[in-house]
């Protein structure tokens, strides 16, 4: 038995492809995104993993990614909890805008600050710090107890909600986490110690 947590960012979405701010909007996966999600499941299967429970967000791109992974593992009916606590960072007034159009409207420097600062939210939206303030407590109270019971847990979510988890798990500073890119459909496998600290981390890239 092992205390195993697997994090996967959803496969490429239609809006990733169009370079739009997505946030809590709900576009579907591209053909490539479906393939990325299935490939993630295949890599997890090759690694010999089976899950006891899965968590995902309230957004379909993460839910479909989660389902593809479970299908590839032969676990299509596994208990899966969907919760908006794991949703992507809310980009507020930027949601649905092309990133170049946003730069034209607010200026390149301001948009860069909204995208790449830790604690400055866009109008009507969340900063990465705000995102972490909902994601990390949900992890501690809901997900981590399963892992510490020596279960294997899947979390299929989003770039920034997963960044918030990785920042806390890895003990990173805001500056360090902002430099971390999470590729779509690439599983990250954490093994935890009994005291909830990280024993090992492995990235299952193609």
From Swiss-Prot:
Q: Does the record bear Oxidoreductase in its keywords?
A: no
Coiled-coil segments on the chain, per record? none
Q: In which pathway does it act?
A: Carbohydrate degradation; glycolysis; pyruvate from D-glyceraldehyde 3-phosphate: step 3/5
Q: Does the keyword Isomerase apply?
A: yes
Marked site positions, Transition state stabilizer: 158
Q: Which residues form the active site?
A: 10, 88
Record's function text = Catalyzes the interconversion of 2-phosphoglycerate and 3-phosphoglycerate.
Quaternary structure and interacting proteins, as annotated: Homodimer.
Provide the protein name: 2,3-bisphosphoglycerate-dependent phosphoglycerate mutase
Q: Which organism is it from?
A: Brucella canis (strain ATCC 23365 / NCTC 10854 / RM-666)
Name of the gene: gpmA
